């Protein structure tokens, strides 16, 4: 039985623009197929929740401090974490095409944060970003730069 949607246009759009905003049906299932096709193309994929990351620039490319919640009499501490994207790009397998960062619940991101995600892919060609921006009746996507320009 042949596949109805091969995902070649989706992969081509990601490779050309670097960052893509997607709209997925609320019943789910479609995004999983496209995630699988992205992995089959040769990208290492990471799935991250967009809300709660804080400053995207420091989270993705700088060593950043994280404070765990202060619960009672514990000492107030700060843990330092390595840069999320930079660390993953340095440790990519040699056969991988690049790193595909899939951010779900991206409708909570501000226009400035979406513009940063579009810009970081221009500075790092091995990084591709997919942001889930909301719901639609069918699986739809656009380059993130077009979405930022229209907003």
Curated annotation (Swiss-Prot):
It catalyses: a plastoquinone + NADH + (n+1) H(+)(in) = a plastoquinol + NAD(+) + n H(+)(out); a plastoquinone + NADPH + (n+1) H(+)(in) = a plastoquinol + NADP(+) + n H(+)(out). It is a peripheral membrane protein. It is found in: Cellular thylakoid membrane. Keywords: Membrane, NAD, NADP, Plastoquinone, Quinone, Thylakoid, Translocase, Transport. GO terms for cellular component: plasma membrane-derived thylakoid membrane. Its main location: membrane. The keyword NADP applies. InterPro entries: NAD(P)H-quinone_OxRdtase_su_N. Belongs to the complex I NdhN subunit family. NDH-1 shuttles electrons from an unknown electron donor, via FMN and iron-sulfur (Fe-S) centers, to quinones in the respiratory and/or the photosynthetic chain. The immediate electron acceptor for the enzyme in this species is believed to be plastoquinone. Couples the redox reaction to proton translocation, and thus conserves the redox energy in a proton gradient. Cyanobacterial NDH-1 also plays a role in inorganic carbon-concentration. NDH-1 can be composed of about 15 different subunits; different subcomplexes with different compositions have been identified which probably have different functions. This is NAD(P)H-quinone oxidoreductase subunit N. It comes from Acaryochloris marina (strain MBIC 11017). The lineage of its organism: Bacteria, Bacillati, Cyanobacteriota, Cyanophyceae, Acaryochloridales. The gene is ndhN.
